[in-house]
From Swiss-Prot:
Keywords: ATP-binding, Kinase, Lipid A biosynthesis, Lipid biosynthesis, Lipid metabolism, Nucleotide-binding, Transferase. The gene is lpxK. This is Tetraacyldisaccharide 4'-kinase. ATP binds at residues 53-60. InterPro entries: LpxK, P-loop_NTPase. Belongs to the LpxK family. It comes from Bartonella henselae (strain ATCC 49882 / DSM 28221 / CCUG 30454 / Houston 1).
Length: 339
């Protein structure tokens, strides 16, 4: 079962935050101890692309961007993923043609279009499997807080619209581990988008002496959007970014239906959405991640008026991925020489 992030996580003052504080303190204690562990080391350079909080921050397009640049530089990148939302057990090498979102999760299928992807709870074992496949660079999708694989560099992604939420640790807030602990172990922050919270986020990062980088998301669509009216539906961590994508392409959002993150739409769900759209003469709109999950449905042929929205990440710093990958390789060589 997949749950949506509670609204009070994104509010500074909340009775529920106060009520859940004792549980949060206990969770924070054990999460700090977990992050103090010495993770197993794989004989490959490892770049972790994670985030500070539970829920979506925009990691997936960032991982894809690094995979593309890595291939341009001559690497054979492999992505280590938890395969969240999937049901396969053990270590599984994702096959885009034969696997589906039910088995491996939507994010793993999206990533498999651009690189080898191995999913497993045991990230070290997944990295070893990718090494056997000929990969010479590991991109770790999430996993910063799990400490299941040594990383040469940790880049944490922050959604500017949400920031660090109310600043509390789960379940009182969205943080996976106290900020102080995470800041001490990460290497740099990638802030995606703009908001009133950007200055505060920049202040916190600069105070640690770590580097801060900026990026923006570019909206892409499978069909013409301008002037069309939409019934938008999605099961993602932050649907506000999806609605913003429609508006950026001059579309009009008339109705919205949001579901829990990684939600698998039933045929009844899709049938109802199609009927509501027809009733009000609306186009349907959803995200690329949601469409991955819809493709296993028998209702796919009835979604003729569906526009799929995807996102591309644009980095403010020129050659950002190239420069950071070079830093990863420098650290990897230093690690090997120190052994």
């Amino acid at each position: 079962m997949h749950l949506s992030a509670p609204h009070f996580w994104w509010k500074n003052k909340s009775f529920l935050r106060f009520l859940l504080a004792p549980i949060s303190w206990g969770y924070a204690y054990f999460s700090r101890r977990r992050m103090a562990r010495h993770p197993p080391i794989v004989d490959l350079p490892v770049l972790c692309i994670g985030n500070f909080t539970c829920g979506g921050a925009g990691k997936t397009p960032v991982v894809i961007a690094f995979a593309k640049v890595a291939k341009e530089l001559g690497f054979v990148p492999g992505v280590v993923s938890r395969g969240y939302g999937g049901r396969v057990k053990g270590i599984h090498l994702v096959n885009e043609e034969h696997d589906n979102a039910y088995d491996v999760g939507d994010e793993a299928l999206l990533l498999a279009r651009h690189a080898f992807v191995a999913i497993s709870v045991d990230r070290y074992a997944a990295a070893q499997r990718l090494k056997k496949e000929g990969c010479n660079l590991i991109l770790m999708d999430d996993g910063f807080q799990s400490r299941r694989l040594y990383m040469d560099y940790a880049l944490l992604v922050v959604d500017a619209m949400r920031g660090f939420g109310n600043g509390a640790v789960f379940p009182a807030g969205p943080l996976r581990v106290p900020l102080k602990t995470q800041f001490s172990l990460m290497d740099s922050v990638l802030l995606i988008g703009d908001s009133d919270a950007c200055d505060y986020i920049a202040f916190l990062v600069n105070r640690t002496g770590k580097s801060l980088h900026h990026a923006h998301l570019e909206s892409l669509a499978s069909d013409k959007v301008a002037g069309k009216s939409f019934l938008a539906f999605a099961g993602i961590g932050n649907p506000d970014k999806f609605l913003k994508s429609i508006k950026e392409l001059s579309g009009h959002v008339v109705q919205t239906y949001f579901y829990p993150d990684h939600y698998f739409f039933t045929n009844t769900d899709l049938k109802n959405l199609v009927q509501r759209a027809k009733m009000h003469n609306l186009w349907l709109a959803t995200t690329a991640k949601d469409y991955i999950r819809i493709q296993t449905s028998k209702m796919q042929e009835d979604l003729k008026n569906l526009v799929v929205f995807d996102i591309n990440v644009n980095f403010v710093q020129k050659n950002f991925c190239r420069v950071l990958l070079q830093e990863v390789m420098i650290r990897f060589r230093e690690r090997k020489h120190s052994l």
